[in-house]
Amino acid sequence: MVVSLVMGWTLFCTTGCWDRVEIDERGFVVGVGIDIPDEQEQGAAEEGNGFAERDYLVTYQLVVPSRLKRAGSSGSSDQSYFNITLRGDTLSSLTAKLSSKTSRSPFFEHLQVVIVSDQVARREGAFSDIMDYFVREKEMRRSLSVMVSNGKAKDILNIKPPNEEMPTKFIHSAAQNTQESSRMLEVSRLGKVHASLLKRDSFLIQLISITKEHNIFINGSALFDGRSNRFIGFLDGEDTAGTNYIRDLVKGGVINAKLNGQLVAYGIERVKRKMHAQITGEKQVTFYIDIHTMGTLEQIYKQMDITKKKIILTLEDRIDQDIARITNHVVKILQQDYGRDVLELGAYLSQEHYAQWEKIKDNWEEGENLFSKSKIIIKVNSIVKRTGNVIESEKD
């Protein structure tokens, strides 16, 4: 009896990992791009499946660990990744189909980036359905990045950036460089995007595109309507910077100001925003936003005497004017062109003026659209902490 128990336990232990897949046999999915099939791709529908309203063209970027090691060694021509593009009407069916298209078992726990094309994001219900799929899948992480592409997502995943082993790795790293540029939106995490969808708040998502030089470019943002959860327009880099200042999300960047026709580069080191609101009657809301910046003159000219306080004060005033121009411009666009509050002013009222907010929230973006009618007064105060490089200008 004892011998039988020992043999049974031994057999159990030795077969405990019968379904294990070796790491070198896995196909790690690190990037996903979602498009609408174009006319040429529609004609190549698989197995007689005609074009449907919800057809997707999905590109999966997979990395092979064994090739990743060899690709890093000198003289190796092995590519550490490969792309597979499939077409279907649901993401779940395409995930199942992916397993039959590669000899390696697809593994999604290391998925870093999901790129949704602007055409897909315009479809009614499409974007929310896609986000819901990724949230519900057990292998997906809520920290993965979500981006919208201006153009085909497939084309972006097919570009191999210089000095990087794979496109997704470059995209994942570059998307986090907000400390270098105020024109980039903060990384749009799946969890936060899904929360905005549930709350039916209008929101922004990082924008990615391809330049004329065929390089990957992360700049600007995609604007989504909170009621329909559909993409409704782009904000360029400067307007995105304006939203970052108002939302207190600027971590760095450069402001180019002019003094006497000469360009001065002001490197931002710290930004602090203060805000308060005043509600008159039941419907008139006024926001007072103070933006304080501190930074360095990174590029100046030798003939400009920066030891004089008057020169520094004039430069600070020019910087104030530039930031005020950027922020007021995006406020005008959001209020007059879109009528959508992606500045999170409604969220501020909900926290700081809850009773009044409950009375006006249904008319904030809809109905009377009180967001568009609210007053937003912005004041900027910039300080030059120290000077940087001096460049001697040409003398006549």
Tell what function each PLM region has.
Residues V2-D396:
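Membrane-proximal alpha-helical signals and transmembrane carboxylates
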